[in-house]
Amino acid sequence: MTFRHCVAVDLGASSGRVMLARYDSKHRTLTLREIHRFVNCLQKTDGFDTWDIDSLEKDIRLGLKKVCNEGILIDSIGIDTWGVDYVLLDKQGQRVGLPVSYRDNRTTGIMPQALVQIGKSEIYRRSGIQFLPFNTIYQLRALTKQQPELTAQVAHALLMPDYFSYRLTGEMNWEYTNATTTQLVNINTDDWDDTLLAWTGAKKSWFGRPSHPGNVIGDWICPQGNRIPVVAVASHDTASAVIASPLANKHSAYLSSGTWSLMGFESKMPYTTDEALAANITNEGGAEGRYRVLKNIMGLWLLQRVLKERRITDLPALIAQTEALPACRFLINPNDDRFINPDDMRAEIQAVCRETDQPVPVSDAELARCIFDSLALLYADILHELANLRGEKFTQLHIVGGGCQNSLLNQLCADACGIRVIAGPVEASTLGNIGIQLMTLDELNNVDDFRQVVSANYDLTTYIPNPDSEIARHVAQFQPKRQTKELCA
C-alpha cells in the first residue's frame, strides 16, 4: 500500500485536536490536516477543579466521524494527552467519583507526608521521577484519605489517554510512558511499585502491567462499520513530542514548549544519583526503552492565564509590543508554586515584583515581557543543570510544540542559553503520535527513521545566539530569583 491514513487525537491541558496524517511510503512524505479542534478547560464541580471528559469524548468521536464521512479509510488511531490525571471505574466500567485535575488544591500538604513517611531518597530511588505536588501518587493518597467512601467502588484506574482508548475500544491498557509520570512505576522493573502504591491506599488490582508503546489496544468501529485499530502510542504528550524532535546527536537538548515547558535530553540510562535528586531531575519513560531525562517548567501557562484574564485575542500584536520593550526590567521565577493556579495571575506576578523591590509590570506588554524574559533565563539555568548532570555541554536546543511559534521567546532562549536554537515542528505531539502508529503498521523502522521523515517534511527555523544581548548579561544574576518555593521542589 502506497498511502497510509492515521488519525492522532492530541489532548493538551488547554485544547484538543483530531488530526489526519497521510503518509506516502514510496516518497516518504508526511502531511497533516486538522480535522477538528476544540477547547479543553477546567470547570468547578462540587468544589473540585475537574475536566469535562464527557465533552472531550464527544469531540473526539466527532472528529473521527468527520474523517470517516470524507470516505477516508483510516489505518489506525492513536491518543495522547497530558500526564498524571486519571479516571476511576467500577466493575461495570462506569465512572467512580470525579475526573479531578492536577491543578486542584486537594493535594496541598500531601507530598510532605510522603517525604516523611517513605523518604525522599527512597521514593526517588524507586521511581526516578521528579517531585511535583500533583503527581498521581499524591492525588491517589488525597483521594483515599479525603474520600474513602469511593475506594470500595473502584475496580480500575485508567490514566487519561488509556481512558479515552477504553471508551473507543472497550479494552483497558496502561501505557508505559504516561504511567511513569505517576511516580508509581518502579524504574528497575517498569511495573507498579508495591511500596509506593501501598502508601497511596490504592489497590494494585486497579492497574494492569504497563505496556510499552506500539501495541494495538483494540478496535473502534466507525459509523460505516469498519474496525479501525487503536494503537497505544507514546501517550504522554511530551513523550510523543520528543519522538518528533529531530535531535541531531547526543549533544542536542529538547524543549517541548506549550502550557508546560519540558526541557531535557534523551538517554539510554536513567539518572538517579544524589546530584539528580538534588536538581529534581525526572526520568520519564520514552519509546524504544529510552529515558526522557528532563525538568518540568511552568511554561506558557502564565501567559495563557494573563491572556484569558485580560481578554487578549491578538497574540502576535502583543508579542510585537513586547519586543519593543527593554529586557529584564521585571523578573520572576516561573516555577514558583504560587503560579500553579492563582485566582488572578496578573496580580500574582505584580505581587512578586513588588515583594522583590522591582518595578511592577502594569501593561499587558510589560506582563508578557516579564514572562518571556523570566522563562528564557530559567531555560538557561536548567540547561546548565542538565549539562552538569551528564558531564557534557549541549551544542543545540530543539524547541517543539506550539510555543516554538513565538519567535521572540525563541531568540531570547538562544541568547540566554548561548547555543543555537532550532524551532519546529509545531505539531510535535501529533507527529510523534503518528510516528508510533506508522512503526506499528511496519511503515517505519524506528524513532530515528521517523525523525528523518520529520526533518525532510517540516520547516525548521534556526536562531543564533547574540552574546551581547541584554538578556545574556542577566543570566548570572537570575539565580537569586529562583530562591523561592518552587513547584518542582
Swiss-Prot record:
S-S pairs: 68-222, 353-370, 413-417
InterPro entries reported in the protein's UniProt record: ATPase_NBD, FGGY_C, FGGY_N, Rhamnulokinase
GO molecular function terms attached to this record: ATP binding; glycerol kinase activity; rhamnulokinase activity
GO BP: any one term: rhamnose catabolic process
Catalytic activity reported: L-rhamnulose + ATP = L-rhamnulose 1-phosphate + ADP + H(+)
CC cofactor: Mg(2+)
Residues reported to bind substrate: 83, 236-238, 296
Record EC number: 2.7.1.5
Keyword annotations of the record: ATP-binding, Disulfide bond, Kinase, Magnesium, Nucleotide-binding, Rhamnose metabolism, Transferase
Enzyme class: transferase
UniProt: ATP binding residues: 13-17, 259, 304, 402
Cellular component GO terms held in the UniProt record: cytosol
Residue numbers annotated as active site: 237 (proton acceptor)
Pfam families assigned: FGGY_C, FGGY_N
Pathway(s) of this molecule: Carbohydrate degradation; L-rhamnose degradation; glycerone phosphate from L-rhamnose: step 2/3
Family the entry assigns: Belongs to the rhamnulokinase family.
Function: Involved in the catabolism of L-rhamnose (6-deoxy-L-mannose). Catalyzes the transfer of the gamma-phosphate group from ATP to the 1-hydroxyl group of L-rhamnulose to yield L-rhamnulose 1-phosphate.
Alphabetized NCBIfam families for the sequence: PRK10640.1 (NF007925), rhamnulo_kin (TIGR02627)
HAMAP family named in the record: Rhamnulokinase
Protein name (database record): Rhamnulokinase
Gene (name only): rhaB
